[in-house]
Amino acid sequence: MADVLSRFNSGKLWDFKGGIHPPEMKSQSNSQPLRHLPLGTDFYIPLKQHLGTTGNLLIKEGDYVLKGQALTKGDGLRMLPVHAPTSGTIKSIKPYVATHPSGLDEPTIHLQADGLDQWIERNPIDDFSTLSPEQLIHKIYQAGIAGLGGAVFPTAAKIQSAEQKVKLLIINGAECEPYITCDDRLMRERADEIIKGIRILRYILHPEKVVIAIEDNKPEAISAIRTALQGANDISIRVIPTKYPSGATKQLIYLLTGIEVPSGARSSSIGVLMQNVGTMFAIKRAIINDEPLIERVVTLTGNKIAEKGNYWVRLGTPISQILSDAGYQFDKHFPIFAGGPMMGLELPNLNAPVTKLVNCLLAPDYLEYAEPEAEQACIRCSSCSDACPVNLMPQQLYWFARSEDHKKSEEYALKDCIECGICAYVCPSHIPLIQYFRQEKAKIWQIKEKQKKSDEAKIRFEAKQARMEREEQERKARSQRAAQARREELAQTKGEDPVKAALERLKAKKANETEPTQIKTLTSEKGEVLPDNTDLMAQRKARRLARQQAASQVENQEQQTQPTDAKKAAVAAAIARAKAKKLAQTNSTSEAISNSQTAENEVEKTKSAVEKTEENSTALDPKKAAVAAAIARAKAKKLAQANSTSEAISNSQTAENEVEKQIVR
């Protein structure tokens, strides 16, 4: 910190590497005083005009609003509000073309002016020191002030983040880019208000040194600031050489102190804070006049504009209307740029509105603009590296961007590129290096945003898992406490702990299971000691009887539920008859009479079974038929062995007749 101040106090100016001296072209617009354009009828106010997040709407369609009324609100210093540039009615809130080279739409408020230009109630003050630094920062935030030098970073957030670190406060009045003269004219005409805004910021930050840096090509502005200071020594002026891009933050700090801001760090890390002169004017108007940021100075220049100069322009005014009021000669062959020729953005749609970012509208003719030359191969001449004010290697970054080697692009400090456009300006191969670098930055940003969202999702998932585990543990703890309470209650009412009693019963059961089994013995006739298996044999006998009884029950059940197949039984009987006839021819003993009678009885039984079957059911049971046939064959075989007389033939014939009758039936 002290090193920064000692170097600054030496009064020496350092020169940064690289840089160029393009034609200034500032005389087109800096000779005329600040003017106002006619109040328009339609204003398009984007909800987000700063580097940060969009505020929350305070109005709806059809509402009547006054000039300076807040249309959105935020919940943090980086969520700046936007305000009504005039009084009128809210016609719609919907997407509208953005002031961006992409030409995409963004959420926008359409305000139709009533022509009265009526302010909201304001509370101006004369002495800002009656308010605390915190109150002043809050008022700056409520006024919606963002950096008007081009970065549009929320001013209140920038001040608060550096509040305890600032030793050197630099007010940037360099305005180094060609054509642009809005800061020059503002310093010439509103120097008193700029100085008051600087003193408000000094009161908030308490820096040891405050300096206004102005390029030496603005003698009128330098004189006006000196006059406004009236010999005061609390603010000093440093006149710096005209060189592009001396107005860039890191380059101007190096010019005044000889110290480089570390890569990836902010200027506040070395005790320096920088603000634009236009921002100082806006701070004064917000604190002293109680006016939010609803207008800014815009340079209208280029040979296609008849009334060149610097104008007070209400934010939200369509660019087409501004150009028309300034005498713009429309020509589709020549584009319109928002900003200067080095860092400006080509506008695809002139219906886009002026925002806090727009400091210049450039409308060149054929003498100032030509179609880009055809891109050729890089010849590695090192012109871009020699001219780069940030000590980068644009030719290497070009190859990395083309091959989408994002890791190498970051290793070669692409993020430090200030997009000043010098590399493309000096390139003999007409390579649009800035376009490549902007696209590469956008791709890297998208990759990091995707990774950031993935990490956030992982954190949320892990937090959810931890919460679920915690809730599960709490649930178990509640269950344990409830169980303990029940045990204590039972112990008090019944005199014993149920859990303890259950454990004792379990222990007793295990003890019984482990006791040795007593083996019974008996003594034989010979005096030998033998195991007594009486109980075991009785158990076996009981199990055998149980199995037999179960089988008998199953058989009886099957006989009751499954009827005999009459046809199968008849066939079996016929087979038995044939075998009996064959056997009867060889048997002739008198015993055949009795056996033949037995066969007749069997036939009668079969007949009875068939009749019973026909009475009970018409269903067929193949299994029963097979059993009946087997029984008939066995009985026929037995009869054949006993029959030996000739009478058996007659009896067998009789049996055959009976079977045939049965079949016929």
From Swiss-Prot:
Binds 2 [4Fe-4S] clusters per subunit. [4Fe-4S] cluster 2 binds at C388, C417, C420, C423. Its cofactor is [4Fe-4S] cluster. Disulfide bonds: none annotated. InterPro entries: 4Fe4S_Fe-S-bd (IPR017896), 4Fe4S_Fe_S_CS (IPR017900), Ion_transpt_RnfC/RsxC (IPR010208), Nuo51_FMN-bd (IPR011538), Nuo51_FMN-bd_sf (IPR037225), RnfC_N (IPR026902). One of its GO terms (cellular component) is plasma membrane. It holds the Pfam family Fer4_7. Its EC number is 7.-.-.-. It is a peripheral membrane protein. Keywords: 4Fe-4S, Cell inner membrane, Cell membrane, Electron transport, Iron, Iron-sulfur, Membrane, Metal-binding, Repeat, Translocase, Transport. Residues 465-477, 485-513, 602-615 have a biased composition (Basic and acidic residues). GO terms for molecular function: 4 iron, 4 sulfur cluster binding; electron transfer activity; metal ion binding. Residues 368-398, 408-437 form the 4Fe-4S ferredoxin-type domain. Residues 465-568, 580-623, 637-665 are annotated as: Disordered. GO terms for biological process: electron transport chain. It is found in: Cell inner membrane. It comes from the Bacteria. Residues 554-564, 585-600, 643-656 have a biased composition (Polar residues). The complex is composed of six subunits: RnfA, RnfB, RnfC, RnfD, RnfE and RnfG. Belongs to the 4Fe4S bacterial-type ferredoxin family. RnfC subfamily. Part of a membrane-bound complex that couples electron transfer with translocation of ions across the membrane. This is Ion-translocating oxidoreductase complex subunit C. It comes from Haemophilus influenzae (strain 86-028NP). The gene is rnfC.
